[in-house]
Amino acid sequence: MQLKSQEMRKLAPELDPLRIGTGWKKEDLGKVQVMVESTYGDSHPGSGHLNILVEEVRKGIAEEGGFGARYHCTDICDGESQGTDGINYSLASREMIANMIEIHANATPFDAGVYLSSCDKGVPGNLMGLARVNIPSVFVPGGTMNAGPEMLTLEQLGMYSAKFERGEIDEEKLDWAKCNACPSCGACSFIGTASTMQIMAEALGLALPGTALMPSTSPDLLAFAREAGRQAVRIAQMENMRPSDIVTMDNFENAILVHAAISGSTNCLLHLPAIAHEFGIEITGDTFDRLHRNARYLLDVRPAGRWPAECFYYAGGVPAIMEEIKEHLHLDVMTVTGKTLGENLEELKNNGFYEKCEKWLQEFNKRYNVNLTKEDIIRPYDKAIGTDGSIAILRGNLAPEGAVIKHTACPKEMFKSVLRARPFDSEEECLDAVLKHKVQKGDAVFIRYEGPKGSGMPEMFYTSEAISSDKELGKSIALITDGRFSGASTGPVIGHCSPEAVDGGPIALVEEGDLIEIDVMERKLNIIGIAGERKSMEEIDEILAERRKNWKPREAKYKKGVLRLFSQHAASPMKGAYLEY
C-alpha cells in the first residue's frame, strides 16, 4: 500500500532536508513514519517518566523498520491546581491536547501514531486526538505509581488535611502523609479519573491487552511500550486498521460495562462521550445508566474499596475483569492487535500473562505483609460487591437533563432522603461553611455556577473530602453541584447537574430552605418543598417559574484566553462538555 509520508515527499521537496536537519538519516526518510505523541513533562508524576517510554516505543518502531518522531504536549495535574483558580483550566486542557495532536499529525505527514499518557486529561485528550486524526494508532498507558508506606495513597491527603484543619491530627502527621503519598512516577494509585481512563483505553481496544495500570516501575511496562511501537508499524501497512475501523458503539458498550465493574470515576461521563463524539458516535449519561443497571461491581480498590490501584494489575487487570463479565461483552469487536477481543482474551490465558501478574501479587504481599489473592481484589462474578453498577443518572425538576452520583461510594443511608437546601455560589464559600461547622445534619449543600460555561467545570474535591471525612456529615448531608468531582471523591456527592446554573438551569433557582428529594434507586432529584414545607409538583413548577422571572444571567466570568473560548463553546456535561463550534 502507498504510504502517506512517501506521497508527501514527492509533493514537498523541502521535507527531506528538514527531516535530516532534525536528526533523521537519509535511509530513515523512506521508512514508515510514526508520530510518537506524549504528554511528557515535569508537570506531575503521571507524565514525568513518559520520555523513557517514548524511547522504548521508538526502539520498537525501528526494530519493525519504521522511524519514530517525538512530539510532546504535556498535561496539567488536577491535584497540583486543586483548590485554586488553576483547576478551572483542567477540563479545557483536554480540548487543547486533542487540538495539538490534530495540529501535529496533520501539519506533517505520518503513517501511524503512538500516544502515551497516564492521567485525567492527558488520556482522554490523546484518545480524542487519536480519533480525530484517524491514522493507524496504538495508545500506551503510562501505568500507576506504587503505594507508599502503610499503603498510603494520594487520595487520602484530603482526609488528612481536613483532619488537620479540625485539629484531629498534628502537623507532623500531615507532613508525613505529604512526603510519602507519591513514591514513584505514574498515575495516582487509586481508581480515580487517571486510572479509569487508562482502563477505558484498553477496554475500547485502543491499547495492547493487559497494559492499563501496570506499575510504572515495572520492566514489563518498558517491554509493552516497545511492542506498541512495533505494532504501530505493522498496522500502518495493513488495510482497515484506522481507529474508525476498530471502534464502534459495541466497543463503547464494552468499556462502560468495565467502568461499572471497576466503579470508575464519574469524570468518565465527561470523557467517553467526548471521545465517542470524535468517532461520530453518540453516548450520553443515559447510556451509562442503562448499562450500569444490573451490572456487576467487582473491584475492591480505592477510593470505593480497600486496596491501592497497583493491585488491579496484580489481579490480572482489564483482561481479568473482562473474563468475569465476558457473557455481557461484545467479544467480536476489533482491537489494535488486529484480532478480536475474544481472541485476545484467549491468547492471554496461554502466554503467561496471568502467571506473571500472580508473581507481582506475591511480591506485593511480602512488601506489606499481607496475604491477598486475586479474588480479594477482583471478585468473582457470582460474588460481586454490588449488582447495580456503580453510577446512576438522577433526573427531576432540579436536573431535567440529568445529574450523576457514584452510588458505590455513597452511604446507603443517603440513597433515599429529603434535605434542606443550603445554596452557595462558589466552592470557597461552601468549604468555609463546612469547616466552620455552619453546615448541619440534614442539609443539601449546593455549589453552583461551577459548570463548563460557568467557570470551566472545576472539581469540588476539598469540599467533598471535608464532608465525607466528617463522621456525622458524611452520612447525613449531600453536596450537589453543576461542577464535577475528583475521581477520588467519596460520600453523598451529586455532580454535573444539568442544565448548569449559568444557563439558567433549575440549580440557579434553588433558595435557602427548599426541600430536596434524593432517590438513587428511583433515579430522582427534585425540589419538593419551599421554606421547609412540602408542596405539590404543580406548585413547585409555579414557584420556580416565578423565581425565573427574577433571575438574571451572570456576566461572563472570563473575558479572554482559553477559558473564554471554553466557556463560550462547551457542550452540556451530559454530552461530554466538549467544544461545540
Where are the regions that the model predicts?
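Glycine-rich, highly charged phosphate/nucleotide-binding loops
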Residues: 90-99
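Catalytic or ion-coupling anion/metal-binding cores of large enzyme and transporter domains
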Residues: 1-46, 55-73, 79, 85-90, ...
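A short, small-residue-rich loop immediately preceding and capping a beta-strand
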Residues: 105-126, 138-141
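Glycine-/small-residue-enriched capping loops at alpha/beta junctions
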Residues: 49
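Acidic/charged coordination and interface sites in well-structured regions
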Residues: 52
